[in-house]
Swiss-Prot record:
Biological processes per GO annotation: bacterial-type flagellum organization
A Pfam family this chain is assigned to: ParA
Native source species: Helicobacter pylori (strain ATCC 700392 / 26695)
A GO CC term attached to the entry: cytoplasmic side of plasma membrane
Gene name, Swiss-Prot/TrEMBL: ylxH
Family note: Belongs to the ParA family.
Protein name (record): Flagellum site-determining protein YlxH
Length: 294
């Protein structure tokens, strides 16, 4: 445990040459979601977080896919305790954080739904968020939410600063993505879209334009931004089986290049003030989450 704490101290003391401000209390929360499962959402979350880390940012990944948390498997790490242990008071937040790289860490989720009881408990939540200083130097936290439009998933999305919806060209995925866009437009003026598993870039653009047209006809105030397409990669399935991050192992693969472009577009939106994001930290995020779960 002491070794883990020491590694975490090193993680938090890393100087970020690409940040020109004191980011304490200014962590930005990027939620990744989808209208249905099986569209590659969690792999995108993990690879996007790694790409942001490679750009020089300090990044956390929060596995908020309640009931199906599996980012530890995707990253190829073993976690003995997760956020449920922290919320129950059985471990400190510092003890559950798993370092992936110096500057990239995982906040592991729980694969059951017991976590909801503790997130909704004010006393447990207050004790948990009082330890937020351990993550206060992170520039970004990527929140991998569940698929669909369930109440718990929506609470995480509403509490985040930026919502990215992942879809594929499959008709059922597009239909579910629109449902996701529609419900999230009630709380977000701007949403972002990634077209995954496309045969070629123009298929991704066509998927976006189809969704954009329907959304604009029914949700006049919505801004739906296209982050880009990710083509099918012959290497992805291999490295998923091997529990390795493709962006790390094969940075020149088309998948990795697309992830880097998407990360760059997101950063340009979030760092130039195109999106109005208040200064906040993990405590603010969880307090908003509690409000939406209420």
């Amino acid at each position: 445990m002491n070794n883990q704490a020491s590694r975490l101290d090193n993680l938090m003391n890393i100087k970020n040459p690409k940040s020109f401000f004191d980011n304490k209390g200014n962590t930005k929360f990027i939620a990744i979601t989808s209208g249905k499962g099986g569209v590659g959402k969690s792999n995108i979350s993990a690879n996007l977080a790694y790409s942001l880390y490679k750009k020089g940012y300090k990044v956390g990944v929060f596995d908020a896919d309640i009931g199906l948390a599996n980012l530890d498997v995707i990253f190829g790490v073993k976690t003995h305790k997760n956020i449920l242990h922290a919320l129950k008071g059985e471990a400190k937040l510092q003890e559950i954080i798993c370092e992936i790289e110096p500057g990239l860490c995982l906040i592991p989720g729980d694969s059951g739904e017991e976590i909801l009881k503790y997130i909704s408990g004010a006393e447990a939540l207050d004790q948990f968020v009082d330890e937020e200083g351990v993550l206060s130097s992170l520039d970004y936290i990527v929140v991998d939410t569940g698929a669909g439009i369930g109440a718990t998933t929506q609470a995480f999305l509403n509490a985040s600063d930026c919502v990215v919806i992942v879809t594929t060209p499959d008709p059922s995925a597009i239909t579910d993505a629109y449902a996701c866009i529609k419900i999230n437009s009630k709380n977000k003026d701007e949403l972002f879209l990634i077209a995954n598993m496309v045969a070629q870039p123009k298929e991704g653009r066509a998927t976006y334009e189809r969704l954009f047209k329907v959304a604009k006809n029914n949700i006049a105030s919505l801004e739906l931004h296209y982050l880009g397409a990710i083509e099918n990669s012959s290497l992805l399935k291999r490295y998923v089986r091997e529990r390795k991050i493709l962006r790390k192992i094969a940075p020149n693969d088309l998948f990795s290049q697309s992830i880097d472009q998407i990360a760059g577009l997101l950063v340009s939106k979030l760092e130039t003030g195109a999106l109005e994001i208040p200064k906040e930290g993990l405590k603010s995020f969880f307090k908003r989450l509690l409000k939406y779960l209420g």
